[in-house]
């Protein structure tokens, strides 16, 4: 018998997360490691747990995540979106609540490219009037 699970994909910056939601006791595993071990920063862990806390499902699911690309913040944001999408696949009634909190929206902000003749994307050389 196959294990029933819900799936959601999340992306942020250059990070991608594949999230699998199963009935369980609240364990969150990212790339084979527990959430607390994978993310050193508490803020990243809080970001990941937000959709579960909002829908009061912290103890009802085991979550298996595969995160790739980007850095800590990007991966945390990608996982959050993936969890939100998987929760909606599990229960459609949660969608309005999650959308209102902003968890269903893909954060479209990307790194602006460096321009030729400038130091960075917008940082130019110091201007001298004389």
From Swiss-Prot:
Statement: the UniProt record of this protein carries the keyword Ribosomal protein: yes
GO biological process, one term: translation
Protein family per UniProt: Belongs to the universal ribosomal protein uS9 family.
Source organism of the structure: Stenotrophomonas maltophilia (strain K279a)
Keywords from the UniProt entry: Ribonucleoprotein, Ribosomal protein
Keyword Ribonucleoprotein assigned: yes
GO cellular component: cytosolic small ribosomal subunit
Domain of life, source organism: Bacteria
Protein name, UniProt field: Small ribosomal subunit protein uS9
Gene Ontology MF terms: RNA binding; structural constituent of ribosome
Pfam family, one: Ribosomal_S9
Gene that this sequence comes from: rpsI
């Amino acid at each position: 018998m196959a294990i029933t699970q819900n799936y959601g994909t999340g992306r942020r910056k250059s990070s991608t997360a594949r999230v699998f939601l199963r009935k369980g006791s609240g364990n969150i595993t990212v790339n084979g490691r527990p959430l607390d071990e994978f993310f050193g920063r508490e803020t990243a862990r809080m970001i990941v747990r937000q959709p579960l806390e909002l829908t009061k499902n912290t103890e009802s699911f085991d979550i298996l995540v595969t995160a790739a690309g980007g850095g800590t913040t990007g991966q945390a944001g990608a996982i959050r979106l993936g969890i939100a999408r998987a929760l909606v696949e599990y229960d459609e009634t949660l969608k309005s609540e999650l959308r209102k909190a902003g968890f269903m929206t893909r954060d479209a902000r990307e790194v602006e490219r460096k321009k030729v003749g400038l130091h960075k994307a917008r940082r130019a050389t110091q201007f001298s009037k004389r």
